[in-house]
Amino acid sequence: MDKRIYLCLAHMSGKEISFIQEAFDTNWVVPLGPNVNAFEQDLERFVGQDKKVVALSAGTAAVHLALLACGVGQGDEVIVQSFTFCASSHPVTYLGATPVFVDSEADTWNMDPVLLEQAIRDRIDKTGRKPKAIVPVALYGMPYKIDQIMSVADKYDIPVIEDAAEGFGSKFDGQVLGTFGKYGVLSFNGNKMITTSGGGALICPDEESKKEIMFYATQARESYPYYQHERIGYNYRMSNICAGIGRGQMTVVDEHIAHHKYLCGLYRELLADVEGITLHENPSGRYDSNYWLNTVLLDGNLHVRGEEDAYRETVKGAVGGAAGVTHESVSAHTSCEPNRNVEAMRVCLDKAGIESRPLWKPMHLQPVYAANPAYVNGVSEGLFKRGLCLPSGPYVTDEDVRYIVNEMKKSIL
C-alpha cells in the first residue's frame, strides 16, 4: 500500500473554512468571540442534561480548572485513574496536591469502583482527610462504571470530575459521558473525535459554575474598567479561530462516531478467526463507546516475527520532535514495558505503513509518580503489557482495515 495509515487523522467537514474566514473578515482573531460562543452552544446541545460548557485551550486546562473549582489545593489528595494519559494527573500537581492512583477493572479497563472505595477509606485512615476529588477516565472512548463510581462518590461526598477527553459522544445508559459528575472534561486535540487543532472544554453543572470557570480561564480579571486581579488566573480561553474549526466539526460529529463504531464491527469480523488476539468491546448494552481507538490484546503465547529484536530500534523513530518527543533515551528498555510480541507487531505494522501504538502506561508505573500512593490489582499493568491501538479514524477505509488485519496475520508465526 502506497499511503500510510494513521491511528486517527483529523477529518474536515468543509464548513470549517467559512467560520474561520468569518473570523478573519470581522477581525475576531483573538481568544473569545462569536465562534467561541456558538461552539459552546453547539456543545451544550450535544451533551444535553441542561449542562453549560466552557471552551478552553486544551483538555489539560479543563482538568486543571475543574480541580481548582472543586477546591483542590496545596497538600490535598485527588484520586485519579492510573490507566490513563498523563494529562489526567499532571494538573493535580499544578495545584500542589498529590495524585492518588487507583487501578482498573477488567470489563471497561477503567477505574475499579471497589478499589476506589478501598482507596478512599485508606486515605481517610492514613491522613484523617477525604480526597478532594475523583477523576475516572473514559479510556479509548469506553465508558467507565459511572453508576458505581457515583454511588461511592456520593457516599463520601466527594465531587467527580469525568475525564471524557477520549470519550466525546460515548454514553452510559443513553446519557453522554461528562454529564454525570460535577464536571466533565473534553478534548479536541488533532487526533480526537472532533478537533479544534488544539483545544478542550469543560462541562459545568450550571451557569454560575460556567462563569467561575470563565473567570479563572481569562486571568481572573475583576470587573473594573482597569486591570484588577484579586486571585490567580490562567490564559486558558479558546481562540475564536480554533472555535471556528470546532463549529465545522460539530456538523459531522455524529458521522465520525458512527464510522469509528463501524470500524470496530469490521475489526470484530476480520479478527474473529485469529487465535490469540482479542478486540476490546462494550461489556454490555449499557455501554456505548465511541471507539475513539479500537484496541486489541495479544496473548502472551502468541509469537510474532522479530520478537528477539523487538526493542532494538524503538527510539530511532521516536526522537525528533514531530510528536513533541525531544529527549533521546540511553536505552530502549524500562522496568515495565509491553511484551515483546506487542512491540514486534507494532514494528511489523510500521514497516507495512500502518501506525499503531501500545496502550497507555499506567501512571503508578511512571518514574515521575514512583512515590505516589497507588491502589493496584495488576489489571492495568497486564493490559499495558498486552495491548495495542489500531487505526480507527474517519479516513480509515474498509480496504485499510482488511489490509491491517492481513498484515497482523502475516506477522504471526
Predicted regions and their residues:
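N-terminal "arm"/small-domain region of PLP-dependent enzymes with the aminotransferase-like
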Residues: 1-30, 391
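Phosphate-binding glycine-rich loop
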Residues: 32-77, 91-93, 101-103, 126, ...
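PLP-dependent aminotransferase class I/II
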Residues: 34-41, 50-51, 114-118, 125-129, ...
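Conserved PLP-anchoring active-site segment centered on the Schiff-base-forming lysine
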Residues: 66-118, 318, 349
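Hydrophobic/aromatic ligand-binding patch that stacks against planar heteroaromatic rings
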Residues: 90-92, 152, 241
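Helix C-cap/helix->beta junction micro-motif
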Residues: 95, 155-156, 352
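Active-site phosphate-binding strand-loop segment of PLP-dependent enzymes
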Residues: 107-196, 201-203, 208
